[in-house]
């Protein structure tokens, strides 16, 4: 036989040089008989290697195994030590567990039969080489040692999974040198990547692993395989006797685990299904942590699961006597101590009497007989694996409280969340064994050092910082389940009994990680609602605000809140310049947020009287000179308790006050922009997230940007052309008074030519073929290159076109621009004739499951919506003429020119002529009777039935999450938003110039439900058919339904043109189109035709049948005509899409009733509360 195996012949000379003493692996100063430690090895025990082979005092490989030339141990030729014995002298010159650089000089050869009958190394004395210089030669066909070879270069690798015969209960005892394979041998073969070593040479203890030197995740992995799994072999018998792996989690099938890879490696077809293998071999992953490479990589260390050796999770110091399981490493002060039973030797002895405590602490890897260890395996798994999130067994290392803190901190990181709760990484074509453990519950801890000083641990804990308060809130809800579900008759260990009543940090983390997806979702919703409630908002709308609705709220209201915050900073800066100190904070629910002089809403900063409820907004405070007279007079006796509004208030009596502190607003602004970036919500605000502008500086002064130099948005060339367009059409904030529009207007967002070029370059990049840059080149263009010309021509054309439109539309364009900004609608150019409007939305279900986003899109564009199917939930007995005839109401007369006028008729006379036209009272030819009633407390049953029948309850219901009325203060009266009952007589076909509701503009959104309509008489069918044929294809109705009312709805941006048209065609005083005021004119077919042909304004026509609802956005002019006698119920709501437009209309409505004015003055407050609720819901969302 050859003196050297063939796979070692090409070894360099320096690798084959024998040590000085002549015996490979012999340690100086030791006798040949002490070359091997006589000790047993527990399952899961790590054994380090030096120069590719085992070389520590704990080495238990067979005699003659290949050793390195440095710090090696002696090997005995011919006869090895007896099993079960150990030598205390081994520990004399050692310093505890030491890792050396390990590097395979040669790849192992794997060939030959799958399961050889006998195993054993070829002893040098049986070979032809020199026994002292020729190392052990393996039989190439019978290699039992399966090593981890897919490792980092010059990094430690792990012990071969081969055990002595006495550890294999299923195998008969053989010669001392016959070492059968362990039940789960693994092979990793591959080249060594060129990366720095993880451990230094000759270092004491462990070094911190640098995550920067981990192997890249995309590095190709080596082929893996298993040996000795042929039918009838020892390994196959052991696998069959082993049964299902203890590492397998409950509910996990073998399909998701590793298959038999032995035939793949050896060339045998895998025809017989094999039993599932454990995810990691015993003793491989022990003290190096659970991640070798970063999450998501397919490297070896990451795919290895937790080690098989269970650990004792209970706290307490370790027991001093030695001889404990090698799986328990030396514990620092405060670490989790090992189980008592693991420390006692079955022989009743521990370490020798001559060993010191220091030596016992260093000799942490001493092995105890595995019989006792294997007996406790299932017991420990039953007790602790589920409690401490150890699927299939706990790690062999002891874990300190600092490690628990690290685990809690890592659990909140995005990487860990993505790896632990997301789908498992895709397996490669030939995955390594152990990948089956990857999943939703796979441990994703980073490598941590075990041996270290207490000072280092404290320093690391200080660097980590305190934990989040939300984690403590979650931990308080968890229940301790330690040692509650164990086998009958099994006694708990002493340390577990001591910790039975405590709920540790690690236990809470494990409980939280083990929650089902439904429980996690419920817990997240509870935490989100708790966070929102702590923010101070109302409990109703914030309790169940989901992620989709919160994003919609924030996308529609975030820009407006930024404008409000910008005005707030300007107000504070002006107050500081006037010498005012920090504003006082006061917020009482019963105080109306309304200016006592201009009746505009108060967002935050304002002036108030210290003796009464008199308040002034910032604009009125400037006019009144608030805060100035106090310095001049120097006395405050001039204002007394007599400070009623009739007597007026002295300027010195006003105090600068805030409802919300500036610090709270700054935090909300910062968090809102962070949520925008997190969920990719597109905002178009001017503000730059800088909390320093809110913080008061030295001497009470605040750093505030001047009003003349607002921050400008950074240009981009990502194809977003609407961003620049929306910024250019920015108008003063909705809360500004009309008198301040001219003075408070900000300059254009493009003060320089460079910014103008940047803002238009995006459009030009998309429009021209030869332009692919955001800015024009500085160098002159070639004669054949017209890029500069195209850019300049486009800029000039856009400016000129805009100026032409402004001149053509007159002074009302700026108000119309505000309307366009509120609805994000393009301005319709003036043409002789326009094409019909776009298709309208008709919802067949009141609460659509799949059409909600479609409704939001149409609603954002300012289009009306028709909804059918409401009659299914309406109780006809509550809305019929017989039930409503007993109710009272106000009867009004409506004419074609003028608002409704009250009459002397009572409601009884009105209801008698409702169904019988011959009994109706005598009226003028150009008038129609109406009846109006507010549904209040006496109509509780009807209000309840209406609330349950409302379509799109997120918008229309009072407590809808997208209805800003639900965010208003609780003490505010909502009379304008209460349901209103309207009944009207039908209009004859020959009187088409009359309507049941004249052309008007509502300040808020409107929904009108037709609850009842009288049956049509036979002559009316022909008139209805003629009427439908004259719609010119601009209407929407449901075929086959009983058409009862006709709606004409115009665009909101066309209101200014319609107003000018009415001033031309209507008598003086009848052509006003004031927001919130009753209509004074009805446009018949002739006037609508003139408006369409001469002014380019067209309308949508909707035909409404009983049981249908029409939704009209705020600011959209509309009128209604009843073909028959009808009863309808209308209700107003405040949607986020039209909130900015509603605020502008509120300022323009001079004749609004006081209760309406008080309601709309709180719009800014509702926006603030809605944004705060949305930010709170999205801040912790995933």
UniProtKB/Swiss-Prot annotation:
Renumbered to this chain, the signal peptide range is: none
- Name the major location: nucleus
ZnF (C6-type) ranges: 595-620
Q: Where is this region: Disordered?
A: 227-257, 302-380, 411-443, 507-546, 697-746
Q: Where does Fe cation bind?
A: 1000, 1002, 1118
Show the Pfam families listed in the entry.
JmjC
Provide a GO biological process annotation.
Answer: negative regulation of DNA-templated transcription
Please note every region of biased composition (Pro residues). 307-321
The short sequence motif called LXXLL motif 1 sits at 561-565
Keywords, sorted A to Z = DNA-binding, Iron, Metal-binding, Nucleus, Oxidoreductase, Transcription, Transcription regulation, Zinc, Zinc-finger
Biased region (Basic and acidic residues) positions are 722-731
Tissue-level expression: Expressed predominantly in brain, hair follicles and interfollicular epidermis. No expression in dermis.
The Swiss-Prot or TrEMBL record lists the needed cofactor(s) as:
Fe(2+)
Please indicate the residue ranges that the annotation assigns to the motif LXXLL motif 2: 753-757
Enzyme Commission number(s) from the entry? 1.14.11.65
Q: Which disease is it linked to?
A: Defects in Hr are the cause of a number of pleiotropic effects including structural abnormalities of epithelial cells in the hair follicles, hair loss towards the end of the first hair growth cycle, and the failure of subsequent hair growth cycles. Older mice carrying a hr mutation have been reported to possess altered ratios of T-cell-dependent B-cell responses. Mice homozygous for hr mutation are uniquely sensitive to UV and chemically induced skin tumors.
- This protein's name: Lysine-specific demethylase hairless
User: From what organism does this protein derive?
Assistant: Mus musculus
Gene that codes for this? Hr
């Amino acid at each position: 036989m050859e003196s050297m195996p063939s796979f070692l012949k090409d070894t360099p000379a320096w690798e084959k040089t024998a040590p000085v003493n002549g015996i490979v692996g012999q340690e100086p100063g030791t006798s040949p008989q002490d070359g091997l430690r006589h000790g047993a090895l527990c399952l899961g025990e790590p054994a380090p290697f030096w120069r590719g082979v085992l070389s520590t005092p704990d080495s238990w490989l067979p005699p003659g195994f290949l050793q390195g030339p440095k710090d090696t141990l002696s090997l005995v030729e011919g006869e090895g030590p007896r099993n079960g014995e150990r030598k205390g002298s081994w520990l004399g010159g050692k310093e505890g567990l030491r890792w050396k650089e390990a590097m395979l000089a040669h790849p192992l050869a794997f060939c030959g039969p799958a399961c050889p009958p006998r195993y054993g190394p070829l002893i040098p004395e049986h070979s032809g080489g020199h026994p002292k210089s020729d190392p052990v030669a393996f039989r190439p066909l019978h290699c039992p040692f399966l090593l981890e070879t897919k490792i980092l270069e010059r990094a430690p690798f792990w012990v071969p999974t081969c055990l002595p015969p006495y550890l294999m209960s299923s195998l008969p005892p053989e010669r001392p040198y016959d070492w059968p394979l362990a039940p789960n041998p693994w092979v990793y073969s591959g080249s060594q990547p060129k990366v720095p070593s993880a451990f230094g040479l000759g270092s004491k203890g462990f070094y911190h692993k640098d995550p920067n030197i981990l192997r890249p995740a995309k590095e190709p992995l080596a082929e893996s395989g298993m040996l000795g799994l042929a039918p009838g072999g020892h390994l196959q018998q052991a696998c069959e006797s082993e049964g299902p792996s203890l590492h397998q989690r409950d509910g996990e099938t073998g399909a998701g685990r590793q298959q038999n890879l032995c035939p793949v490696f050896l060339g045998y077809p895998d025809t017989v299904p094999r039993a599932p293998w454990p995810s990691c071999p015993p003793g491989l992953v022990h003290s190096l942590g659970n991640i070798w490479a970063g999450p998501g990589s397919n490297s070896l260390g990451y795919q290895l699961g937790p080690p098989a050796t269970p650990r004792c999770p209970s706290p307490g110091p370790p027991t001093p006597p030695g001889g404990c399981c090698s799986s328990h490493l030396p514990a620092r002060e405060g670490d989790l101590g090992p189980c008592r039973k693991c420390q006692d030797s079955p022989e009743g002895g521990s370490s020798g009497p001559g060993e010191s405590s220091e030596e016992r602490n260093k000799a942490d890897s001493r092995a105890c007989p595995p019989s006792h260890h294997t007996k406790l395996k299932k017991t420990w798994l039953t007790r602790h694996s589920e409690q401490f999130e150890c699927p299939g067994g706990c790690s062999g290392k002891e874990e300190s409280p600092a490690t628990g803190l690290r685990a809690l901190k890592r659990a909140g990181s995005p990487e860990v969340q993505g790896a632990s709760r997301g789908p498992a990484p895709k397996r490669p074509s030939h995955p390594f064994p152990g990948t089956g453990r990857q999943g939703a519950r796979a441990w994703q801890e980073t490598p941590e050092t075990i041996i270290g000083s207490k000072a280092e641990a404290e320093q690391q804990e200080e660097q980590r910082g305190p934990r989040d308060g939300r984690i403590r809130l979650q931990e308080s809800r968890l229940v301790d389940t330690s040692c509650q579900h164990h086998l009958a008759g099994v006694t708990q260990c002493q340390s577990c009994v001591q910790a039975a009543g405590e709920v540790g940090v690690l236990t809470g983390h494990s409980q939280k990680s083990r929650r089902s997806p439904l429980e996690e979702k419920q817990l997240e919703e509870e935490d989100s609602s708790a966070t929102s409630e702590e923010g101070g908002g109302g409990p109703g709308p914030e309790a169940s605000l989901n992620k989709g609705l919160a994003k919609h709220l924030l996308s529609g209201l975030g820009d407006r809140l930024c404008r409000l915050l910008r005005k707030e900073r300007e107000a504070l800066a002006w107050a500081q310049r006037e010498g005012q100190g920090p504003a006082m904070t006061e917020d009482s629910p019963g105080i109306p947020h309304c200016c006592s002089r201009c009746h505009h809403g108060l967002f935050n900063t304002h002036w108030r009287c210290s003796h009464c409820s008199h308040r002034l907004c910032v604009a009125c405070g400037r006019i009144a000179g608030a805060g100035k007279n106090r310095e001049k007079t120097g006395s405050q006796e001039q204002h007394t308790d007599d400070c009623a509004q009739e007597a007026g208030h002295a300027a010195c009596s006003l105090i600068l006050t805030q409802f919300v502190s500036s610090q709270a607003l700054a935090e909300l602004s910062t968090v809102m922009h962070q949520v925008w970036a997190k969920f990719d919500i597109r905002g178009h605000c001017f503000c730059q997230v800088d909390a320093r502008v809110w913080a008061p500086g030295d001497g009470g002064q605040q750093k505030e940007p001047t009003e003349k130099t607002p921050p400008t948005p950074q240009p981009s060339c990502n194809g977003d052309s609407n961003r620049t367009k929306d910024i250019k059409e920015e108008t003063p904030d909705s809360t500004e008074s009309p008198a301040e529009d001219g003075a408070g207007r900000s300059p254009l967002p493009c003060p320089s030519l460079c910014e103008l070029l940047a803002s238009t370059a995006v459009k030009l990049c998309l429009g021209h073929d030869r332009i692919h840059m955001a800015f024009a080149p500085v160098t002159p263009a070639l004669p054949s290159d017209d890029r500069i010309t195209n850019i300049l021509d486009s800029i000039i054309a856009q400016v000129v076109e805009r100026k032409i439109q402004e001149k053509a539309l007159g002074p009302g364009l700026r108000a119309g621009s505000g309307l366009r900004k509120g609805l994000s609608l393009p301005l319709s150019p003036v043409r002789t004739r326009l094409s019909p409007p776009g298709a309208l939305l008709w919802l067949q279900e009141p609460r659509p499951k799949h059409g909600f986003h479609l409704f939001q899109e149409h609603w954002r564009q300012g289009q009306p919506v028709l909804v059918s199917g409401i009659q299914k939930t309406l109780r006809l007995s509550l809305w019929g003429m017989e039930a409503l005839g007993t109710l009272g109401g106000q009867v009004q007369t409506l004419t074609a020119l003028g608002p409704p006028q009250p009459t002397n008729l009572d409601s009884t006379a009105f209801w008698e002529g409702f169904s019988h036209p011959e009994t109706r009272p005598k009226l003028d030819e150009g008038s129609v009777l109406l009846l109006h009633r507010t549904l209040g407390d006496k109509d509780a049953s009807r209000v309840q039935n209406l609330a349950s029948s409302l379509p799109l309850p997120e918008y229309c219901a009072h407590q809808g999450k997208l209805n800003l009325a639900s965010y208003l203060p609780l003490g505010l009266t909502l009379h304008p938003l209460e349901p209103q009952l309207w009944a009207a007589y039908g209009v004859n076909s020959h009187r088409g110039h009359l309507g049941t509701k004249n052309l008007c503009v509502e300040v808020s959104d409107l929904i009108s439900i037709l609850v009842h309509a009288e049956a049509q008489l036979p002559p009316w069918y022909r008139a209805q058919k003629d009427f439908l044929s004259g719609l010119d294809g601009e209407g929407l109705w449901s075929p086959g339904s009983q058409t009862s009312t006709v709606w004409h709805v115009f665009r909101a941006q066309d209101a200014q043109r319609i107003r000018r048209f009415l001033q031309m065609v209507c008598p003086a005083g009848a052509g006003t189109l004031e927001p919130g005021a009753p209509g004074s004119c009805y446009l018949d077919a002739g006037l609508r035709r003139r408006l369409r042909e001469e002014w380019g304004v067209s309308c949508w026509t909707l035909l409404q049948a009983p049981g249908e609802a029409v939704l009209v956005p705020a600011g959209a002019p509309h009128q209604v005509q009843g073909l028959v006698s009808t009863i309808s119920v209308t209700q107003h709501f405040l949607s986020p899409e039209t909130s900015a437009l509603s605020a502008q209309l509120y300022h323009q409505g001079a004749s609004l009733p006081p209760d309406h004015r008080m309601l709309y003055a709180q719009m800014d407050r509702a926006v603030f509360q809605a944004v705060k609720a949305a930010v709170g819901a999205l801040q912790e969302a995933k």
